[in-house]
Amino acid sequence: MRKTVNIVISGAATVLLGLGVLLNAPAAQAGGQAPDAKTCNDKDNPPKDAVTQGGCVVIDRAKGNCMGCHQIPGTTSGDIATKFENMAARWPDKAKLREQIWDASKANPNTVMPPFGRHQILSADEIDKVVEFVLSL
């Protein structure tokens, strides 16, 4: 009986420790999902890689706010536009994806997607980082 209790306690401790590690890891580190706001707003240790920086633009409601329309893993997201999954397979030409983000009305004049580049909502550098993030999904 004592051995069984020790095994159960040991197993529970292992599970809780694992959950603690997972919950404290930055979301972008998990891969395939958006970074969390804590990661994006960390002034002492800001994200350095383009994928995470692009993810931070995507979830920033004052900037990209992509999650307002798109389903993005790791966010509470919209469902009125294309779901962000298998993006590298769906957009094998990085330049075309960049052009879509820059000004989606060139491909579809009736789109509701804002022309992020043409209207200077995002800088060229921010768009490049968003492209890197989107292609990581």
Locate predicted features.
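N-terminal export/targeting leaders of redox proteins
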Residues: 1-40
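Axial heme c-ligation environment in periplasmic c-type cytochrome domains
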Residues: 30, 77-87, 102-129
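Gly/Gly-Pro-rich "capping" loops immediately C-terminal to redox-active cysteine motifs
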Residues: 48, 67-102
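Solvent-exposed, polar/charged alpha-helical surfaces in well-ordered, non-transmembrane soluble domains
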Residues: 52-56, 82, 95, 99, ...
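Protein kinase-like catalytic domain
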Residues: 70, 134-135
